[in-house]
Amino acid sequence: MRTKKLPALRVGVGGPVGSGKTTLLEMLCKAMRERYDLVAITNDIYTKEDQRLLTLSGALPAERIMGVETGGCPHTAIREDASINLEAVDRMLARFPDADVVFIESGGDNLAATFSPELSDLTIYVIDVAGGEKIPRKGGPGITKSDLLIINKTDLAPYVGASLDVMASDARKMRGDRPFVMCNLKEQAGLDAVVRFIEQQGMLAAPAAG
């Protein structure tokens, strides 16, 4: 836990359907819950399926996970009109005022989806190798402007004819100095780097002694 109470860090997680957003949330919660006070908000259009899956995984106690039904285009609820998610954040922080981190998972969307700065302090965008080697060079705000890009499911590269070297090279070209991580989240490969990024960029890590 942070020794000095700061406002909860809000981490937005976006990406296309099936890229691994819910898996990332599960792994992050399990990796960080012993050190930090965590809550999570999931977005789906017509159901609360991601909330159910995250709860069943045991990532956090059920009361610390809230599902939001956006009822429309997923990116609208995190960007143009984020009021439904801002209200969800307020409700969770009223329930858990000592929370260190609020994870906000968007509904699956296209490469143009981004989080409103009012809603998210840090943004993580997840794509997956199965979507094709060309995905990083297609660009879009999620790929070029997110604070951290995750290229997930690296284990599938041989099966879909994708070159991880090409994907990494294209990610560097599209993102400049912005970081990215190659991951196989099912096996937790690359997870430590994501946790370190959140701790360092979100100023969660305890300062060094002395």
UniProtKB/Swiss-Prot annotation:
One Pfam family it belongs to: cobW
Subcellular location(s) per record: Cytoplasm
UniProt binding sites for GTP: G15, P16, V17, G18, S19, G20, K21, T22
Any one GO CC term of the record: cytoplasm
Sample GO molecular function, one term: GTP binding
InterPro entries documented for this protein: CobW/HypB/UreG_nucleotide-bd (IPR003495), P-loop_NTPase (IPR027417), UreG (IPR004400)
Nucleotide-binding keyword on record: yes
Keywords linked to the UniProt accession: Chaperone, Cytoplasm, GTP-binding, Nickel insertion, Nucleotide-binding
GO terms (BP aspect): urea catabolic process
Record Gene3D superfamilies: P-loop containing nucleotide triphosphate hydrolases
Highest taxon in the source lineage: Bacteria
Family, per entry: Belongs to the SIMIBI class G3E GTPase family. UreG subfamily.
PANTHER family for the chain: UREASE ACCESSORY PROTEIN G
Known role: Facilitates the functional incorporation of the urease nickel metallocenter. This process requires GTP hydrolysis, probably effectuated by UreG.
Oligomer and partners: Homodimer. UreD, UreF and UreG form a complex that acts as a GTP-hydrolysis-dependent molecular chaperone, activating the urease apoprotein by helping to assemble the nickel containing metallocenter of UreC. The UreE protein probably delivers the nickel.
Name recorded for this polypeptide: Urease accessory protein UreG
Origin species: Ralstonia nicotianae (strain ATCC BAA-1114 / GMI1000)
Lineage, top ranks: Bacteria, Pseudomonadati, Pseudomonadota, Betaproteobacteria, Burkholderiales
